Every structure is written in C-alpha cells, then in structure tokens.
C-alpha cells in the first residue's frame, strides 16, 4: 500500500536519488546532501515545536508500506518571506499615451513583488517517474490538504504554489536567458543551485528594482511567461481542480506561474470530513477513489482507498488500518478525489 508519512533522517539516501531525477528547476530539492539533511532536520524540529513560524516547514514522503521504498516527496512551508524576502514578479500593465499624437500603448510589465509574504506554500512536489501511475500523483499532492485540514490553525489564510517553468533537458531557461542572466551573470543552473542550498542573499543584491517591459525580452522568453514545464502540467491541473488559480504572479528565475487559493476554499479541505473506522472487509462495489488520513500530528498517514465518500463508518482491512496508523473506533478524515480523477 502506498502511504504518505512525515520525513525521517533515514530518508536522506532516497531523497538524494529523487533529487538526481528532477532534471533541474526544482529549487527546493537540490542534489546536495547537506542541504537535504538540513531540510529534514528543520521538518523534524517543526513537528517538535522548536521553530518560530517563519522557519517552520513540513516534509512528507510517499512510501510503499510493504517494501519501505520511497518514491516521492512533497512539502509545506508554513509562512514564506518572514525571514528571507520571498520574491516574484507581478505581471501587470503600464499605459503610455498621448492624445496629441493619437498614441495609446498598454505594455505588459513585470513588477518585482513581495505580495505573498506570510502565505503558506505548497512546495517540493516530485514523484519518481516509475511511480507515476495508480493515482500516486494525486495522493502525493493532495495529502497535504488533509494535513492542513486536520491542523488548520498551523497555517495561514492564503496558500500559494510555485509551478516549475519552462526549462529544457540541458537546464536552459528562455526566461532566465533573456532576463535573469543579464543581472546575475550566471547560468540558470548555478542560480537555481545557490537558491536551493539557502544562499539567497544574491537575489536581493542583484535583482532589478524597476519595472521591466516584457517587450524588451526575447519572443521565446515572452512565450513562456506563466507557462509550466511539460512534466509539471499534471501537477498544475491537480491544483486547479482544487480551486487554485493563476493571478499573474511568476517565478523570478524561470517565469513559471504562481498559483494561489484561500485555504478554506480549497476543495479537499472544504469538503473533507471525519468518519469512524471499523475493521473488516470493505463491501464490494464500484466506489470512487478517496483520500483517507489519520488525525495524528506526529504520526500522520494518508492513503488512497476505494470507498463510499458519503459513508459515516469506513470499513478498512487490518493491513489498511496498520498502514494508516489507526485502529477500529478512531476517526479519520475522508474526501473523494475529483470526479474526473479516475486513473487509480
């Protein structure tokens, strides 16, 4: 059974393997053992209540409960930008007009922004290519909503998610090549690595402070503003089905879109509910895939099961109960996947 659980120190080797498969552009999952070890330690200190809000971040892994193999990672930052500034570009408009000359130009413009400061962030979503089947992607992404619903007071009103922008297999980013490289004088992969390993001071020091007309960028760069990496398109679709929207904010490095949603309007959070569990054999039937999660903060587990989403008493097998770290009589959180998400 595939389950979501909190990260552990022993996961470092598995995370290094996952980081080596990202193909670049996933800033928060660098192939750097010291950085990943520090990320794990920060997550564990978050669970133990040792960190201030601005440093808190949860990390989860997707595990095969029978073999112990890890095939994915996802994370939540509790509040971005409270320690280091959290930058993006807002895609807006500047109008230049002259009645005398009968000229009117509305020009798309990039404005440096810290507008999402304090928001909770969904981040570090990566699923091993060999695991991209049987609904694992839905489980990996949406399990975070089950955790947020259970422990709502630990998160802020707005949730954001930066989507990976367009980058080729060689690490070439049209947006970076046309804009960022002119100010940072380094390749995208180098800037991405520095940011991913926590060396972010250079961003504030070198970022252009004035608005930038997108017409000054190459046509190739203009075309990828707000667009996602092909491998990220499914993740974007999953979030959009949950209520997330692109509000014209983009990543300063690759131009990928930032999606956002008020936390209480996220579908899985809004519609999830608590039901009692019982041990037994689930009744036969063509039931939809549902997310099921326990309410145990320190030993959180989430999985996909086929069940009646309207039930008030969820019957699970002994193996399922064990994987979810719960027992008969406990209450678990239940919500079905979106109706069109049937590939489980």
Swiss-Prot record:
Gene3D superfamilies: 2.40.40.20, 3.40.630.30. The keyword Metal-binding does not apply. Pfam families: AstA. Induction: By nitrogen and carbon starvation, and arginine, via the ArgR and Crp transcriptional regulators. GO terms for molecular function: arginine N-succinyltransferase activity; N-succinylarginine dihydrolase activity. Its EC number is 2.3.1.109. Keywords: Acyltransferase, Arginine metabolism, Transferase. Succinyl-CoA binds at residue 125. Pathway: Amino-acid degradation; L-arginine degradation via AST pathway; L-glutamate and succinate from L-arginine: step 1/5. It catalyses: succinyl-CoA + L-arginine = N(2)-succinyl-L-arginine + CoA + H(+). The keyword Transferase applies. GO terms for biological process: arginine catabolic process; arginine catabolic process to glutamate; arginine catabolic process to succinate. It comes from the Bacteria. The active site is at 229 (proton donor). Catalyzes the transfer of succinyl-CoA to arginine to produce N(2)-succinylarginine. Belongs to the arginine N-succinyltransferase family. This is Arginine N-succinyltransferase. The gene is astA.
